[in-house]
């Protein structure tokens, strides 16, 4: 009864869908050309070989971390799911060049909200790869993860993973 009175009884949804944060070609995690991601050292997920330079939020939640080098964003859902959107490979070395971050740490976001714009051609020419990993960094806290085998994905529209948190 007190929970209802004071609003602390909010039921957190354990199930969450992760949508494509980029438009492009779906890449299985094992096929990402970087062993840290391909061997799932950072967690389960997938990659996208983008065809355009805009990243949108793949989940509803909040921005947990904007990397100072602008190449990656950490997101957190209400149910505890933590997601890393990493734009390209070895892009940390670009030191923010070619990236424009549109959100700040602590911002609330919904699926499809723009997070980052980037110069696809610049990254293609100056980084190891434009293939962008999307990783569940707290995979160990998930009860189940169902990854759909897609081909082409559309940012904010194509559902790629269903996760149930513990």
Swiss-Prot record:
Zn(2+) binds at residues 71, 86. Its cofactor is Zn(2+). The active site is at 86 (tele-phosphohistidine intermediate). Residues 34-138 form the PTS EIIA type-1 domain. It is found in: Cytoplasm. Heterodimer with glycerol kinase (glpk). The modification Phosphohistidine is found at residue 86. It comes from Staphylococcus aureus (strain MRSA252). One of its GO terms (molecular function) is kinase activity. This is PTS system glucose-specific EIIA component. Pfam families: PTS_EIIA_1. InterPro entries: Dup_hybrid_motif, PTS_EIIA_1_perm, PTS_EIIA_component.
